Amino acid sequence: PGRLRTAYTNTQLLELEKEFHFNKYLCRPRRVEIAALLDLTERQVKLWFQNRRMKHKRQT
């Protein structure tokens, strides 16, 4: 029973990308803040950043 894939809204993606551009690694307080702001779980934010860094690595 795998976890459901999260469908991020455009707004959420925009904010996450903006944050990523500014900072590739999040400290926990910031993660909590972003999760609350975007109505996501901390886990979702953490995983998004993890995946985004991998994608970033592949692109360079």
UniProtKB/Swiss-Prot annotation:
Superkingdom of origin: Eukaryota
GO annotation, cellular component aspect: nucleus
Subcellular location per the Swiss-Prot or TrEMBL entry: Nucleus
GO MF term set: DNA-binding transcription factor activity, RNA polymerase II-specific; RNA polymerase II cis-regulatory region sequence-specific DNA binding
CDD domains: homeodomain (cd00086)
DNA-binding region: 1-60
Broad class of where this protein is predominantly found: nucleus
Keywords, comma-separated and alphabetical: Developmental protein, DNA-binding, Homeobox, Nucleus, Transcription, Transcription regulation
Recorded family membership: Belongs to the Antp homeobox family. Proboscipedia subfamily.
Described function: Sequence-specific transcription factor which is part of a developmental regulatory system that provides cells with specific positional identities on the anterior-posterior axis.
Protein name: Homeobox protein Hox-B2
Source organism of this protein record: Salmo salar (Atlantic salmon)
Top-level taxonomy: Eukaryota, Metazoa, Chordata, Craniata, Vertebrata
Name of the encoding gene: hoxb2
